[in-house]
Each structure stands twice: as structure tokens, then as C-alpha cells.
Amino acid sequence: MSWRVWRDHGMESQFNPRVAVGNAAAVCLAAWAEQSVARKNELTGRFDLAYGPHHLMRYDFHPAQKDRPIIIINFHGGYWRALDKADMNHHMADLAKGGFGLVNMNYPLCPDVSMTQMMTHLGTGIDDVVKMLDAGGHHQPIIMFGHSAGAHIALHLSHHPKLANRLVGIAALSGIYETELVLELAVNEDVRLGKDEAYKWNCLTHMPAVGPAYYIAVGGSEPSGWIDQSWIMAEALCQRGDSAQFHGCGGLHHFNLVDCLCDANHHDGARLHDWMKSLSR
């Protein structure tokens, strides 16, 4: 169902996850920060590698053994205006336990930059990441992995020329894909999208690359309008002929969804881990 039907029926509660989840959002985000500090020492490799002059143009690299099959490039969420790669360290630790190599990206945020500038900076970041991987002999296939706004970012960056013939999959967790809806929300005070830019970055009118497999996941306890974003995106991919799976995670909301999907010991996480590993075969 189109997001437009919600214009007179609670856009904020449908399309602002912090409003939808209520007090649990702050609890979850505080837990992410606390657990990420506690588990940072589980992550080997290098932190805060620069790909540009802005202080948020940084990424972490956590290599797996070179015979391991997949490298994940992660993009954090936060509605393009908040959070940090460091908030994802405990999720990265869970993925590392699964045997994946990891690149955890930061990027300049709105309103310090526009969405278009953000995507340009991240394109530079992908250039630098691929150069670093190749220089280190890390030639494994790549999966891009993103939550919320990070899912939107991953779909658009699928067109990056340095990822051609190497990007095998995208795991998009509880994403927002029709960016025009942001024009109706309070978060646009920070994101500052205009009509033309919102259209430019709509994932349905500017579809992601043909070739990678897609895993589109969303929490079963999320608002119906938000769930529809993932369903509509998965349906568009399937209609185009892409390999796309839709996974509704029963009982999970926008934030604990990430905890469960990164953890191979959770049944939803085991399914995602298996899907990612299958792409190396």
C-alpha cells in the first residue's frame, strides 16, 4: 500500500521508528552503545581508516581469514542524520563470529551535508575500501548490509563501478525506500530533502543494480506502513526478475530486529547468515 494513504492518518507513527517504538527506542540505542563498547575488543583489525577529510569519512576493517568466503560492508541507520558506526560494534562482533570479514562505514550526516553529498562521499569511501581490500589480497565477494537509512544507502551504492562483478548480495534490514515520504515528516528538518532530491534517491524509481541477490527483512511488529516499504521493494525486485527474498521477522521492532538478525544463534539470524554464506558457493 502506498505511503500516501497515511498522510491523514499518522505519518509520524508509521514512518518514524523512534515514534513507533516509543520509549523502547532509547533503551535499545543505549544498549547498543553500551554493548558496543564492551565488545569492541572482540574485533580485530583497524579502526577509523580515513577515506576523506570530513571527520566522519572513516571506516573500520575487521578481516576474516583469507579463505573465508564473504566480506560484508555495513552502513548504519539513523535516518541519514544520526548514529555512528561505533554503535554497531556489537553487531559487527556477532557477524565476525559467523566468519565474515567486515567493513563498517561511517559517513557525514544531514544536515551537515545533503543526501546527494552523502552519497558522493560514500562513493569515495567504496573506492577506498576496494583499493584497500585488493592491496591486502582480500578478493572475496562482497555483500552490502544496511539497516534503516543504511539499507537505502546500500541499494543505491549497488551501482558503484568498483563493485561490478564482485557484489553478490545486499541485506537490507527494515529500510526506507520511497524518500518522498520524508518530505512529510519532522525528521526533514534535519535531512532537508527537497522534492527533486527526494525523487532522485527513491529506490523504486531508481532501482538498485541488476545482478546481486537481495534479502529484504523487516520486523513483524513494525507499523504496517513501514512494513509495506520492504514488501513493495521486494516485490519490485521480484517483478524485475531479481533473486530476492522477503523475510518478516515475527515479534520484532525496528531496533531489536538488528540484534536478532546479526546473531546466528537466533532463528532469524541463522536464516540470514545461511543466506549470506550461500552466495559464496
Predicted regions and their residues:
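The feature captures the conserved acid-bearing segment of alpha/beta-hydrolase catalytic domains
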Residues: 169-184, 195-232
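Short beta-to-alpha linker loops that shape the active-site pocket of alpha/beta-hydrolase fold enzymes
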Residues: 78, 101, 106-110, 176, ...
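Catalytic nucleophile-loop/oxyanion-hole region of alpha/beta-hydrolase
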Residues: 83-92, 103-141, 262-263
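N-terminal cap/lid segment of alpha/beta-hydrolase-fold proteins
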Residues: 17-66
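Short, surface-exposed "cap/lid" segments of acyl-processing enzymes
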Residues: 65-95
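Primarily recognizes the serine-hydrolase "nucleophile elbow" in alpha/beta-hydrolase
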Residues: 124-189, 198-199
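C-terminal catalytic histidine-bearing segment of alpha/beta-hydrolase fold enzymes
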Residues: 217, 227, 231, 238-281
